[in-house]
Swiss-Prot record:
CDD domains reported for this sequence: Cyanase_C, HTH_XRE
Organism expressing this protein natively: Ajellomyces capsulatus (strain NAm1 / WU24) (Darling's disease fungus)
Active-site residues, Swiss-Prot/TrEMBL: R103, E106, S129
Name of a matching Pfam family: Cyanate_lyase
UniProt name for this protein: Cyanate hydratase
Length: 163
């Protein structure tokens, strides 16, 4: 018996996702592929790959070729579905209802001002970019056998302009 955890999607519970999401997730489930395996095939980070599936990131022409190949989707169909620009941010209700997504929201809610204060002290007046940005998720296991999620955010610092 295989112990594979795969993220799937019930599109009926996510009416704001693009049509491409249903096609991508069905092929992912049919092929029993993790985002890690798909990301490795297309040469992208697994979070960036998942963002394409949710319509939150733009797939390049090369991404589309490789996604069609690994997922067994007709290239022309996938090119049509992924040809537009992402409509970012509309896929999740606010505040989020999913417990894990809500915890991420809660982290920013609870620690946002602390992050801001520390960043301002380290970098000055400005913001961390979410455009010149990368993120990754790693798994750590401590000495007691407890699993820990390590989420890294890396954003370019953008100082406010004086005018």
């Amino acid at each position: 018996m295989s112990n594979i955890n795969l993220a799937t999607l019930d599109i009926s519970e996510h009416p704001n996702l693009p049509t491409s999401s249903a096609v991508l997730f069905k092929a992912k489930a049919d092929k029993k592929l993790s985002f890690e395996k798909i990301a490795s095939h297309i040469g992208r980070n697994e979070v960036a790959t998942a963002a394409i599936f949710y319509g939150q990131a733009k797939a390049s022409a090369e991404d589309i070729v490789k996604l069609a190949e690994v997922l067994g989707i007709d290239h022309g169909q996938l090119e049509f579905l992924l040809s537009g620009f992402p409509d970012r941010g509309k896929s999740v209700s606010f505040p989020p209802k999913d417990p894990l997504i809500y915890r991420l929201y809660e982290i920013v809610q609870n620690y946002g001002y602390a992050y801001k204060a520390v960043m301002n002290e380290k970098f000055g007046d400005g913001i961390m970019s979410a455009i010149s940005f990368s993120t990754k998720v790693e798994k750590e296991t401590d000495n007691d056998g407890n699993d820990w999620a390590v989420v890294t955010w890396r954003g370019k610092w953008l100082p406010y302009s004086r005018f």
